[in-house]
């Protein structure tokens, strides 16, 4: 059972890292886009990145915490799993603080299903009148920072596996 949980944790962390890293790797090219093209591209990420990234991120938090509880308390493996869980929590916090408010702005005029409208309606609408380049930079940098912490979570889970 422990090995299965370790493998699932690493796969979920890899999914989380892939979504955030994908955004980070395309950043140099997207920063060269004119407003018209950038705004046309932004809505295409939904639903793939939203569903895949969300599943990976929430899954990493839950499964890495479960893994930490399954390992001997105070062991290096347990401590590393808890650190991975903390890193995954930071990835989620960064999403809600930096990325989600901008996603809400990008998708405000998009035709999406009712459940998605509900999801993107969560949180304050603090983007009214904001300059598009400020929103772009916030979104792009937010994903770059998230990629660092998502990668860290994956590395910590791999280290936990090695230490177990």
Predicted regions and their residues:
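Hydrophobic alpha-helical membrane-embedded segments
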Residues: 12-21, 88-104
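Core segments of transmembrane alpha-helices
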Residues: 54-67, 146-155
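Interfacial segments of alpha-helical transmembrane regions
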Residues: 2-14, 66-92
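Juxtamembrane boundary at the C-terminal end of a transmembrane helix
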Residues: 158-164
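Portal/gating segments that form or line small-molecule/metal binding sites
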Residues: 70-85, 95, 101-102, 107-111, ...
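Interfacial loop at the N-terminal end of multi-pass membrane proteins
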Residues: 13-63, 107-136
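Membrane-interfacial loop-to-transmembrane-helix junctions in polytopic alpha-helical membrane proteins
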Residues: 1-4, 42-52, 73-80, 128, ...
